[in-house]
């Protein structure tokens, strides 16, 4: 229904110049829609908002004053989520593709705005993007990363029989399992300044032996 209202109010949507790719609603209270322009010269958000907000206001009035956030769609999931979290500003984001979740860090003073009343903002952003979103303060996010890296370092020390420094570098560079060490390309490994070729070959050898054991 929300999408149909925009088709009526925004000619560019009806003409296919702008696509509405998704919508998430808390009926009567708030909604988020994602838009994409098929014409590089056309500002999708500006067209949907209308002059002085006239178009989006007309849609809002039809829905008992429902507040509508118009979000720019992006093929990069992280960028799309950052857009969807508006009006909160995302400081950092950690993507877990396996769990299809993201940890989102915002400034302490923006935490309540990012989460929204009763979790509304993050819930709608999650529904719109299709990702599980965990919002936290920057300090909490940094502490979580530090704790996870420490845990991974211990795993690498034990599983690969390496010293603390090597284990710390593996964790810091984003390796999350022995499997990833085993099957990482030489090109990716060579981008790590702390490792020379001899160490890389030894790490891969130990990782493969561990997996096949």
How would you name each of these model-derived features?
Residues 1-213:
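RNA-contacting regions in translation and RNA-metabolism proteins
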């Amino acid at each position: 229904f929300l999408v149909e209202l925009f088709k009526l109010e925004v000619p560019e949507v009806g003409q296919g110049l702008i696509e509405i790719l998704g919508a998430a609603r808390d009926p009567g209270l708030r909604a988020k829609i994602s838009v994409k322009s098929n014409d590089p010269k056309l500002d999708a958000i500006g067209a949907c908002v209308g002059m002085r907000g006239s178009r989006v206001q007309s849609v809002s009035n039809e829905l008992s004053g429902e507040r509508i956030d118009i979000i720019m769609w992006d093929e990069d999931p992280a960028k799309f989520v950052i857009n969807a979290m508006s009006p909160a500003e995302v400081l950092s984001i950690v993507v877990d593709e396996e769990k299809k979740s993201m940890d989102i860090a915002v400034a302490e003073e923006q935490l309540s705005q990012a989460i929204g009343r009763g979790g509304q903002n993050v819930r709608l952003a999650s529904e719109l993007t299709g990702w599980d979103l965990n919002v936290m303060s920057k300090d909490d996010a940094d502490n979580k990363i530090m704790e996870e890296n420490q845990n991974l370092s211990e795993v690498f020390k034990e599983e690969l029989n390496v010293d603390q420094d090597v284990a710390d570098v593996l964790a810091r560079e984003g390796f999350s399992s022995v499997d990833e060490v085993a099957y990482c390309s030489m090109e990716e490994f060579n981008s790590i300044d702390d490792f020379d070729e001899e160490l890389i070959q030894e790490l891969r050898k130990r990782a493969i032996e561990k997996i096949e054991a």
